[in-house]
Amino acid sequence: VATSVHPQAQMLLDGKAAAGAPPLWELSPDEARAGVDANAAIIPAGPELESVRDIVIPSQAGGMPARVYSPSASAPGLVVYYHGGGWVVGSLDGWDSSVRALAVASGCDVVSVDYRIAPEHVFPAAADDAYDALVWAASDAGLAG
């Protein structure tokens, strides 16, 4: 089990502590989302790709927003990406830079899923959305390419 934090991550944590930022878990969902969005806004843009397009994936709850990142016209596969945020924070835009980097590093198309988040949507909404996206990817992956 790792007991240390990467130096770059530690710099971020130290900077937040020095600025008096409370830990994420002490914030309301709205406060946490605002903080995460503010952090995302200062992250440099990710690499340029062949194409980036917004789509809607069919789901049990209707349509689920998603974004397809294609590093090339002939990507060999598809990665389904579920953003971080403990099922409470996070968005397509907030993870855009990371997903672009993943698409380039993997050489694969990546579909980033904007699943429903809590507390507005109770369990198992996010898990259902994640499953629906995976089923869609397995059956319609050609659509994403």
Cite the ranges covered by each PLM segment.
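Active-site loop/turn elements of alpha/beta-hydrolase fold enzymes
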Residues: 115-117
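A glycine/proline-hinged amphipathic helix-loop "lid/cap" segment
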Residues: 1-68
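Short amphipathic alpha-helix adjacent to the substrate-entry channel of hydrolases
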Residues: 92-113, 128
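Short beta-strand element of the alpha/beta-hydrolase
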Residues: 76-86
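Alpha/beta-hydrolase active-site loop
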Residues: 121-142
